């Protein structure tokens, strides 16, 4: 199982209606994307981020389905223009030592084939973590597991 999560701050210029539309789009992803087994979307407490979401996805094939599903693309198009700071992460019980690279490759393939999404991501104030484009500074931390 892969738990794909993100945490983000909202720009001061975003209206409450825009924010709710983006959050509802995130919730809709969880409801309609077949590979999502469970999800949570809501306020992020205890840190510098305003909101977060976590989606439980069975495997890499399901992860790709999630990334390119129209519901996810809608969230990107509706939500990313409202976001200032974005951080993504993936937690998995899969012991494949290449899992981080495989996840990064899926995200990069999406950026390579969807220029409008890549442009939206490039306009974020800050983007770090497992889903960040390779060109983003500090996008992929070293694997913390012992060799």
Model-based region annotation:
Residues 1-50, 60-65, 84-147:
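Short S/T/G/P-rich N-terminal loop/turn motif that feeds into the first structured element of a domain
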């Amino acid at each position: 199982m892969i738990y794909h999560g993100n945490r983000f701050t909202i720009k001061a210029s975003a209206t409450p209606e825009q924010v709710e539309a983006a959050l509802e789009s995130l919730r809709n992803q969880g409801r309609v994307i077949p590979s999502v087994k469970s999800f949570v979307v809501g306020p992020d407490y205890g840190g510098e981020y305003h909101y977060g979401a976590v989606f439980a996805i069975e495997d890499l094939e399901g992860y790709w389905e999630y990334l390119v599903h129209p519901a996810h693309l809608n969230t990107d198009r509706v939500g990313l223009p409202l976001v200032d700071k974005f951080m993504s992460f993936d937690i998995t019980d899969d012991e494949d030592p290449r899992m981080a690279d495989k996840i990064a490759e899926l995200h990069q393939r999406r950026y390579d084939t969807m220029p409008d999404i890549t442009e939206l991501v490039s306009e974020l104030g800050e983007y770090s973590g497992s889903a960040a484009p390779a060109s983003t500074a500090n996008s992929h931390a070293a694997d913390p597991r012992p060799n």
